[in-house]
C-alpha cells in the first residue's frame, strides 16, 4: 500500500480502501438497506465503469444481507425523479434519470450474476 504524502513532518499516514468489487458490494448492501439516491447513483457510476462484476457479486453473496448474489428484485423501484434531482443536482451534473440509473444497474448485475446462477 503506498504512503499518503504528509503535509507536515508527521509519521507517514496509511489509508486502507476497499477494492472496486468490495466497494460495489458494499454500495449494493447500502442500497438494500436504505435505497438512497446517492447509493443508486454510485452503483450506476460503478456499472458504467465495469465494476458490477462477478467478483463483486460473489462478495455481496458472501458478506451481504441476502446470502446470495444481487437479483433483479433488489432493483425494482427507482427513486422519485424529483427526489433524485433534489438530492443530487447540487452535487454534480446529472446526465441520467433515476429510472435509467436503476435499469442500468439492474442490467449490469443481471449480466454479472448470470454465470453464478445459470448451470454451466
Predicted regions and their residues:
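Structured mid-to-C-terminal alpha-helical surface segments
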Residues: 1-120
Amino acid at each position: 500500500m503506498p504512503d499518503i504524502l504528509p503535509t507536515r513532518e508527521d509519521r507517514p499516514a496509511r489509508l486502507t480502501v476497499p477494492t472496486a468489487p468490495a466497494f460495489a458490494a458494499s454500495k449494493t448492501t447500502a442500497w438494500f438497506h436504505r435505497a438512497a439516491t446517492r447509493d443508486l447513483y454510485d452503483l450506476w457510476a460503478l456499472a458504467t465503469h465495469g465494476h458490477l462484476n462477478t467478483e463483486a457479486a460473489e462478495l455481496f453473496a458472501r458478506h451481504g444481507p441476502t446470502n446470495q448474489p444481487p437479483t433483479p428484485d433488489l432493483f425494482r423501484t427507482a427513486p422519485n425523479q424529483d427526489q433524485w434531482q433534489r438530492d443530487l443536482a447540487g452535487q454534480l451534473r446529472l446526465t441520467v434519470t433515476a429510472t435509467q440509473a436503476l435499469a442500468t444497474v439492474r442490467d449490469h448485475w443481471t449480466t454479472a450474476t448470470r454465470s453464478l446462477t445459470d448451470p454451466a
